[in-house]
Amino acid sequence: MATTTRRSDLDGLSALVTGGSRGLGLLLCARLARRGCRVTMAARDADELRRGAAWVEERTGATVSTTVCDVRDRAAVGAMVEQADNRQGGLDVVIANAGVIQIAPVASIDSRAFEDAMSTVFGGTVNTAMAALPPLHRSDVGGRLCLIGSVGGLLAVPHLLPYSCAKAAVGTLGEGLRAETAGKNVSVTTVHPGLMRTGSHLQAEFGGRASKEFAWFSALAGAPVVSMDAERAAERILRALERRRTRLVLTPAARAASVTHGVAPATVTRLSGLAARLLPNPPDGNGEGPAEGGMVQGHDIDRPAHTVTEKVRGWGSALNDRAARRYNQHLPGPPTSG
């Protein structure tokens, strides 16, 4: 019996992805390119963009455009969107994915951590969405705007408070834009992923007892039971865009946490407090951080584990380290193509 390939509603459209040079954004660019989309990949780092574009082109055979842009800069974002709109003959899909993540107890950070998270995660999303809406309204097929939030925006996660606050704002923005663009040729989809194996632990910023914060986060983010394969996550997101869904919460753990928080928020807050007691205590002094995950003292993703503790922790972090190599997160060198 002959088999047929299901045509996607996204096939051949024009797309722009911010934070597209690595991790989830890189995979979204690749899957859009595989669908025959004209893709612009945007990020702050020119070298990362070059490597990311080469990775996508090697895997898909498609050519992607790149734009260096800091999403915190409103004028630069406007120019980026205008350039993609002109170059690609319009815009049909825009995915606001750029962001930063800080991991530290609140006692080890100050207001600047919140300002940084809000300016990049929320401010960058606002800049992208507001610049993208006019060309999306003009789309012949109806524009699709996707905002990447987080389960951390649906409930506060211990040691990720600035990130949670910023992602909560992204979630509210998505709901508001969905309501105000209803019936106006644009659909807005907000995605709230749980933990994903993207290798992002190497790009996150760690404070307090940085090496211990890095250890728990990298292991948990790579654990198969609670984290999601990044390729699968990217495909789920694009399917949600195809169907013009309002909201998507990824991973069973994230969905369970979100539902429980909606029904019994006080109980979830108490459980979060218990979880916080299991995490590293703030240092007495200034601590080790802040430092990017790839620069945390003692971390070497190619170093074998020797102690039992290292082996147990490595069960999760090894998968995340593998994802880091694959998805352009590994700081010392280029990604693999596997």
PLM segments and residue spans:
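The beta1-alpha1 cofactor-binding region of Rossmann-like NAD(H)/NADP(H)-dependent oxidoreductases
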Residues: 46, 68-79, 111
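Residue(s) in the substrate-gating loop at a strand-loop-helix junction
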Residues: 150
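SDR active-site lid
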Residues: 183-255, 259-282
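Conserved glycine-rich cofactor-binding loop
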Residues: 14, 19-22
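Conserved glycine-rich Rossmann-like NAD(P)H-binding loop of the short-chain dehydrogenase/reductase
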Residues: 35-51
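Substrate-binding pocket helix/loop in short-chain dehydrogenase/reductase
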Residues: 105-106, 110-115
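Active-site helix of classical SDR
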Residues: 129, 166-169
